[in-house]
Amino acid sequence: MTITGKTKVAGIIGWPVSHSLSPPMHNAAFEALGLDFTYVPFPVAPERLAAGIAGLAALGVVGFSVTIPHKVAILPLLDRVTPEAELIGAVNTVAVEEGALTGYNTDGIGLLSALRSKLGFHPEGRSVLVLGAGGAARSAVASLGLAGAGRVEVANRSPDAGRCLAEAMRERLAGTDFGFQPLGQISDKGYMSSFDLVVNTTSVGMAGDAFAGLDLAALKPGACVYDMVYAPPVTPLLAQAEAAGVPWANGLGMLAAQGEAAFRIWTGAIPPEGCMEKALAARLTTPGNP
C-alpha cells in the first residue's frame, strides 16, 4: 500500500513490541478492505508510558493496541474505560476520538468468539475450569461470568492469587458461582467430571511443559479444551485432549478474534472472515517467528 498524508494510523504499544503479530494481522485486513490505514508497532518504555500515549493522541492516531507491560498501568491515564475493561482491570485496546482516549478489553470477546467458532461452545449455564490466575485468566473468568456461565473454577499454583481472583469476581458478578482450587489438587476424577470446558490461560505448554495429573478423559461427555497458547500449535495439553477424544482448539482463534474486535472499534468495518487468522498463521509458519 502507499502511505500518504491522508493515511490513518493505528498501532500497538509495548516493551518490547518488535515480536508482535498484530501488525501483519491488521494490515492484512486493511488491505483486504481497501482501507487507507496502516498499523505499526510503537516501543514505549514503562517510564515513558504517559508521554507515549499523549504523543500518539497528539499525532492523531485512530487507536492502538496495548500489550505487556502496559495493560494495567495505562488505566489511570485514559479518559474513559469501558465497564468490561474496568471489571477485568486491564486494557488491550484504546480508541482515540477528538483527543480523548477510551480503553477497551477485547480479550474476553476474542475468547468467547473462538469458543463458539472453533468448538461450538456457549458458556450459558456451563461449568468451566480456568487454569491460571494472571491477567489472561482474569479476562477469561470475567468474560465467562458476563456470558452467563453457571460455574467458573480457578485453579492456580499460588493459592492467594487464585482465591483473590475468584473472590473479586464473586463480588461483582452474582449470577455465576466462582470458586478456587489449588492446581495440585485437581487430578481427582470426580472433580474433573463436573466440567464442560477447560481453559488454559498460562504459558505452560510454550516450551513443551505440561500440567501434571490432569485427567481430561474424566471430563463431562461433550466437554472441550481451549489453550490460549498458539505456538506450538499443539501443546502437551492439547495432545492429551486429542488422545482422550476431547475436542480442542489453540489460542490462534482468540488472538484473531480480539484483533477483529479492535479493528471494528477503530474503523467501524468488519474484517473479511478468516483474513486475520490466515495472516497470523502465515506469519507463524515463517522461519524465525514465534
Swiss-Prot record:
Pathway membership: Metabolic intermediate biosynthesis; chorismate biosynthesis; chorismate from D-erythrose 4-phosphate and phosphoenolpyruvate: step 4/7
User: Which positions bind shikimate?
Assistant: S20, L21, S22, T67, N92, D107, Y230
Q: According to its record, what are the GO cellular component terms?
A: cytosol
Q: Domain of life of the organism in this record?
A: Bacteria
Quote the catalytic residue positions.
Answer: K71
Q: Biological process GO annotation list?
A: amino acid biosynthetic process; aromatic amino acid family biosynthetic process; chorismate biosynthetic process; shikimate metabolic process
List the EC numbers from the record.
Answer: 1.1.1.25
Q: Which reaction does it catalyse?
A: shikimate + NADP(+) = 3-dehydroshikimate + NADPH + H(+)
Listed GO MF terms: NADP binding; shikimate 3-dehydrogenase (NADP+) activity
Keywords (A to Z) from UniProt: Amino-acid biosynthesis, Aromatic amino acid biosynthesis, NADP, Oxidoreductase
One Pfam family name is: SDH_C
Q: Which cysteines are joined by disulfide bonds?
A: none
Locate the residues binding NADP(+). Answer: G132, A133, G134, G135, A136, M228, G251
Identify the InterPro entries for this entry: Aminoacid_DH-like_N_sf (IPR046346), NAD(P)-bd_dom_sf (IPR036291), SDH_C (IPR041121), Shikimate_DH (IPR011342), Shikimate_DH-bd_N (IPR013708), Shikimate_DH_fam (IPR022893)
Q: Does the keyword NADP apply?
A: yes
The subunit field of the Swiss-Prot or TrEMBL record says:
Homodimer.
- Can you tell me which family this protein belongs to? Belongs to the shikimate dehydrogenase family.
What is the role of this chain?
Answer: Involved in the biosynthesis of the chorismate, which leads to the biosynthesis of aromatic amino acids. Catalyzes the reversible NADPH linked reduction of 3-dehydroshikimate (DHSA) to yield shikimate (SA).
> What's the name of the protein?
Shikimate dehydrogenase (NADP(+))
What is the native source organism of this protein? Citrifermentans bemidjiense (strain ATCC BAA-1014 / DSM 16622 / JCM 12645 / Bem) (Geobacter bemidjiensis)
